[in-house]
Amino acid sequence: MDDTLRTCHPAVSFAYFALVIACAMLLMHPVCLVLSTLGGGWYVARLLGGKGLRRHLLWLLPMALLAAALNPAFVHQGVTILAYLPSGNPLTLESLLYGLAAGAMLSAVALWFVCVTDVITSDKVVYLFGRVIPALSLLLSMILRFVPRFVRRLRAVAQAQRHLGRDTQTGAPARRVRSALRVFSIVVTWSLESGLSTADSMRCRGYGLPGRTSFSLYRFDRRDGAVALWLAFCGLYLLGGGLAGGLRFQYYPMLLSGPVTPLTVSFFAVYGLLCFTPVLLDSLSRRRYLARKGGTPRA
């Protein structure tokens, strides 16, 4: 069964990612960071499989650890001194924990952007913004598909060059460098020519002209309306929680969090449901499909 959020209206999918990424960047409470990272990681595994998630974790984990290490090296605020650096500056617990929180935030945002590139395809970007900002929408659609297409072309060209005896992994170091540069030059030239051809093709078809109409298969149905209402509720509820201080967590000069009350727990619960909304949509779609299949009489 296909991912349910991918089959929703592009405006609904875009609104969900805009909301969840904004919350992932703004809410630095440890509970929110854990929920956002787990939700983004699960969705990446749902879209790309476990192998795809592991491939992204190979560079996300070092990035998070680097952020955690750099922050206490340059920021020395905090009242809990753990040790003193060779420079004489204090190493504080608060700066270390804030570095870990910043690394978790960057990892969560990166995971959600991986999901964006898989769900919000180039045709959806053109559909959403083609009439309002046609030039920018075309540029965004080309950017979204540039990296995956560049990687595929890089692999294809490298394989073709390998069959011609120009392998980038065997031979003398100088020869491998020349082969790698040749492969990179071919792929860059290919990508630039493709981008120019796409721009010329869209211009010849009248893209961006006033009054131009376009054909689309997207229809806003009742399911999209229900998801949009759910996103509006989550956004307003979390906004109220942020203004009320229920999602606030202070790192400097000392660790300080608001009191744990049923209201603050409800804020975290709503945020967790927001991060795992794709799970809920898939579960509801699966139950509806099984119920419909079970109620259909056999021939």
What are these model-predicted stretches?
Residues 2-48, 156-299:
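Transmembrane alpha-helix interface motif
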Residues 34, 49-58:
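Interfacial helix-loop-helix linkers and transmembrane-helix boundary segments
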Residues 56-174, 290-299:
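Juxtamembrane/interface alpha-helical elements of multi-pass membrane proteins
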